[in-house]
């Protein structure tokens, strides 16, 4: 499991906060944002819509450590919320959270299901029933994995994989307690075609 690369985003300090001014900001090709966090004052930001949208559409912002270049000052952050236009689906506002590189953070990491070809249950026609596609973990910012792999090797129809079965990279641990050993994926039998009995007709 490889660690994620840090994504860099440029931003400027923003003084305006009124709705009309924010609308004007968007018309000029910018996106309003904010960064907040424990022990920090809230800071209003302006982002380039073109630059941010490119990163957003590439999927590089999900569960990634962000290096924010705020008017020349670097801050580390996570994207916590992206508000989209209800009709146009364009980015309207972005929330960031300050990250202290020396402390652990909570973050959702996508699960990657590997070795389907080595699962007898799937070879026999079983269906992979995914119940959980991401999981909350704790780690230091420099240990954030790109994905957490779930190994399907050897799994038969009717078998499941639970969260405690998943191996985590060094320095990464689950947020959930050990007693919450919930199921993340099962291999189920495919629905078989059943012929309906023909109704008898009287002559």
Curated annotation (Swiss-Prot):
Cross-referenced InterPro entries: Rbsml_bL25/Gln-tRNA_synth_N, Ribosomal_bL25/Gln-tRNA_synth, Ribosomal_bL25_b-dom, Ribosomal_bL25_C, Ribosomal_bL25_long, Ribosomal_L25_dom, Ribosomal_uL5_bac-type
Gene Ontology CC terms: cytosolic large ribosomal subunit
Classification via Pfam families: Ribosomal_L25p, Ribosomal_TL5_C
Molecular function per GO: 5S rRNA binding; structural constituent of ribosome
GO biological process, one term: translation
Keyword field: Ribonucleoprotein, Ribosomal protein, RNA-binding, rRNA-binding
Ribosomal protein as UniProt keyword: yes
Keyword Nucleus applies: no
Sequence similarity: Belongs to the bacterial ribosomal protein bL25 family. CTC subfamily.
Record's function text: This is one of the proteins that binds to the 5S RNA in the ribosome where it forms part of the central protuberance.
PANTHER family documented for this protein: RIBOSOMAL PROTEIN L25/GLN-TRNA SYNTHETASE, ANTI-CODON-BINDING DOMAIN-CONTAINING PROTEIN, RIBOSOMAL PROTEIN L25_GLN-TRNA SYNTHETASE, ANTI-CODON-BINDING DOMAIN-CONTAINING PROTEIN
Subunit structure: Part of the 50S ribosomal subunit; part of the 5S rRNA/L5/L18/L25 subcomplex. Contacts the 5S rRNA. Binds to the 5S rRNA independently of L5 and L18.
UniProt name for this protein: Large ribosomal subunit protein bL25
Protein source organism: Wolbachia sp. subsp. Drosophila simulans (strain wRi)
Gene name linked to the record: rplY
């Amino acid at each position: 499991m490889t660690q994620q690369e840090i994504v860099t985003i440029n931003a400027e300090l923003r003084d305006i906060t009124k709705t009309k001014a924010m609308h004007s900001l968007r018309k000029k090709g910018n996106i309003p944002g904010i960064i907040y966090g424990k022990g920090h004052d809230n800071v209003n930001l302006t982002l380039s819509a073109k630059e941010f949208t490119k990163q957003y559409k590439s999927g590089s912002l999900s569960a990634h450590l962000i290096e924010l270049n705020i008017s020349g000052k670097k801050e580390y952050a996570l994207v916590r919320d992206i508000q989209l236009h209800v009709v146009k689906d364009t980015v309207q506002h972005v929330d960031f959270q300050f990250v202290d590189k020396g402390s652990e953070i909570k973050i959702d990491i996508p699960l990657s299901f590997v070795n389907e070809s080595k699962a007898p249950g799937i070879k026999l026609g079983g269906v992979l029933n995914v119940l959980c596609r991401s999981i909350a973990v704790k780690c230091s910012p420099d240990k954030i994995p790109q994905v957490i792999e779930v190994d399907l090797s050897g799994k038969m129809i009717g078998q499941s994989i639970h969260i405690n079965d998943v191996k985590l990279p060094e320095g990464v641990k689950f947020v959930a307690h050990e007693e919450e050993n919930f199921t993340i994926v099962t291999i189920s039998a495919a629905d078989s075609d059943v012929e309906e009995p023909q109704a008898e007709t009287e002559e």
